[in-house]
Amino acid sequence: IKSNKKAVNAIERGAESIIFIIPNETISLSRLIENIDTTSISLYFDLQFLSDKYILQFTDLINKENIFFHVDIIGNLAKNGNWFSSLQEDHHKFETIVNQINTLSIDLSLYQNAGANMVQQLAYGMSQANEYLNHFDSTLEKGKKQSIKILFHVSVGTNYFFEIAKLKALRILWNTLALEYGFNTQCHIVVIPTKRNKTLYDYNTNMLRTTTECMSAILGGANTVCNLAY
């Protein structure tokens, strides 16, 4: 209920997109989006767990154009060092989920916040994308491939012009890779300022850094920019 009120308040103050972090299966998405116009506001659900049964409860949300689910099993492996369950079980559930939500989501922000340079971020992200495309290449029909939405979560730092170039390069690289597998060549990019250069003790410095980072995200062509709290 608190999250819903915060989201509605943010929308009333001008927010055009909302990102919900879903920590477990007890969270009701229907209650989260009460009083929110899902036709005009983009909604992102970042699931911190893997459950095909949970996703299937919300079939009325799944096919809406501006609603995105973030489920990234390789990203979870990179972050925690473990699968949710096992390699085989995770891929089986992931396949069911992707067939339902029509979305592949890849988290590049993990690599940026871990200290990877821009070339490494793009390389690791494309490598991860290639793993997913290779897995689904034989299981999805051509028409289904074209309907899949591709979502990239990206963090940007203070290297202004290079961050702009990174986002533009990401679209070019994805286009090249997707063409090889026959997938949708358009991608949706969500950008969040990096946490790597932020301090607990000087919020004014944080504000200056996030300002330039968000500006580079806008000029780089991000679809959604989610700033960090002041």
Identify the residue ranges that each predicted region occupies.
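Catalytic alpha/beta active-site cores
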Residues: 1-156, 224-228
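Non-catalytic positions within long, well-ordered alpha-helices that form the structural scaffold/packing
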Residues: 11, 217-218
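Active-site or pore-adjacent capping/gating segments
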Residues: 212, 221-230
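Gly/Pro-rich turn-and-neighbor structural signature
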Residues: 123-197, 205
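Conserved, mostly hydrophobic/aromatic
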Residues: 14, 174, 220
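Active-site-adjacent loop and "lid" segments of alpha/beta metabolic enzymes
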Residues: 201-214
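Acidic-glycine-rich active-site phosphate/pyrophosphate-binding loop
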Residues: 102, 187, 220
